[in-house]
Amino acid sequence: MNQNLTYNINLIGGRDWSKFKKWYIRLSLRKYLKLNENPVIISSNWELSEGLIPYRNKYKFCLVTVLHGLEVTRLQSKRYAKRTKRFVQSILNSDHVISVSNYTKNQAELISGYKQNKTIPNFVNTKKSFIVDKKKSRRKLGFKQSDKILLTLSRLVKRKGHETVINAISLIINKIPDIKYVIAGSGEEKYEGDLKQLVSKLKLDRHVLFLGYIEEDNKNDLYNACDIYIMNSNKTDEEGDSEGFGITFLESNACGKPVIGSNAGGISDAITNRENGLLIEPNNPTKTAQAIYELFNDEKLYNQLSENGITRIKENFAINKVGEKYMEIILNHYDY
């Protein structure tokens, strides 16, 4: 590959992408394709790629479709099954298909039969996720310095498994009386109500804190204020929603935090068991409690996972490392 090539990057935006994405992408790129020779289009969604199918025989361009998780796994549910044919056509009309995890890759191959799918993980933006002083972050957020804090930062939906962590805390509260579980994120009101009822039933009101929606600028302080990041996601729900990757595990690692996650969906791509965190069974409060207790009581293991996590981010998930993998595919496509 020629490492001295220069290139221009253009970001295509638009209004109300969720409803009209394939029409917006078609209108946005028509003029661009006319004026530029052999461009590379990296599409962040298969429905965007679908919008470019009519241009495949008219213009010469390299189409790279990136698959994340939900947009693939939900095709297995009754509600979204009708989209399967469109998905397959979108994949087959792409020059390259990249999945952010092996789990997403396998699901896409199962549905489409396309076997040239490659795996390149999401990157961690280390300008947004980085280590700062834990005491300062706790003071800023109003957390006690003595608390042992677990954090889940995610959409507030049942598949994320918050109730498993709450039940796990009830099993070890006598052994770790200063434990606090911080639930950050908004979502389904009914699910939030169910979680709060469970907290009251287990008499954990002083140990579980609901923060609601979190602004992007506050996320790094949350990661740094916690001791352990945890998310015990379920394998899938009735809508086909599953964890395609789990970027919050890696953002936590970048802040020096060990992580605990369930062996579900693409989480095993984000967590290597006993290297940067602990992988446990989903929906298992006992196993979850054991993992929490182990990390809070084994300082050597805690520090080892913390250090490994930081190193792993730098070596595998930094933006330059992930970018090199994309560039390799693009440059090889045109044989530069």
Indicate where each model-derived feature is located.
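Short hydrophobic beta-strand element within catalytic cores of glycosyltransferases
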Residues: F249, A254, P258-G261, I271
